[in-house]
């Protein structure tokens, strides 16, 4: 279903969308040549709604297989009907595994990437062999022993601003001049029932750093 011209008349507006996705079947957030990234699928859905290509800009990138519960992106497009009807159209056309949660009209100077205040990663490690097969966000350690105190002590050394080049993977010549220093605000190692959760927060991270 394409929207009628009357719906799309007028000046483009800037929209921000908060979305969540199961990254298992996707090649990360950023557009890929194979067209199977989250951003690719979102732009395909928006083109179906608006009848012409729509460019999106995300607040950050995730690697292949990584899930997100608070990814923000923005795009420009005209819309003459209530905001809620656009959100409903997005929920209709977005593919399985990608969920638009909230939609806002922004001022034209809003930029999802520049407005991002920080990023949080959470790793869930199951300590027992059995776990729910449906929960693909948990990695099973299959009853391997975990020294929680040692992990918590090691976590302290990552807090602060450091050169994290040893923890990243280079993506080519374009990164030679990029600073490898990043500021990590918090690293927590928590025991939650039969899980160990590792939470890392910072202003931003290098490629494959976390």
What are these regions (language model features)?
Residues 2-209:
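Structured-RNA-binding interfaces characteristic of tRNA pseudouridine synthases
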């Amino acid at each position: 279903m394409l929207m009628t011209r009357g719906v799309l008349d007028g000046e483009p507006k800037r929209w921000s969308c908060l979305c969540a996705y199961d990254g298992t079947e996707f090649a990360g957030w950023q557009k890929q040549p194979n067209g199977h990234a989250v951003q690719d699928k979102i732009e395909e859905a928006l083109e179906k709604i608006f009848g012409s290509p729509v460019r999106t800009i995300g607040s950050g990138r995730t690697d292949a297989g990584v899930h997100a519960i608070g990814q923000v992106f923005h795009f420009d497009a005209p819309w003459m009907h209530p905001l809620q009807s656009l959100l409903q159209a997005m929920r209709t056309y977005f593919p399985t595994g990608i969920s638009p949660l909230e939609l806002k009209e922004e001022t034209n100077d809003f930029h999802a990437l520049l407005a991002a205040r920080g990023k949080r990663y959470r790793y869930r490690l199951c300590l027992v062999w059995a776990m729910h097969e449906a929960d693909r966000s948990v990695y099973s350690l299959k009853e391997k022993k975990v020294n929680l105190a040692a992990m918590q002590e090691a976590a302290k050394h990552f807090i602060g601003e450091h050169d994290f080049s040893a923890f990243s993977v280079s993506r080519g010549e374009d990164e030679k001049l990029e600073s490898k220093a990043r500021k990590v605000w918090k690293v927590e190692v928590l025991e939650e029932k039969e899980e160990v959760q590792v939470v890392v927060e910072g202003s931003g991270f290098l490629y494959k750093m976390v």
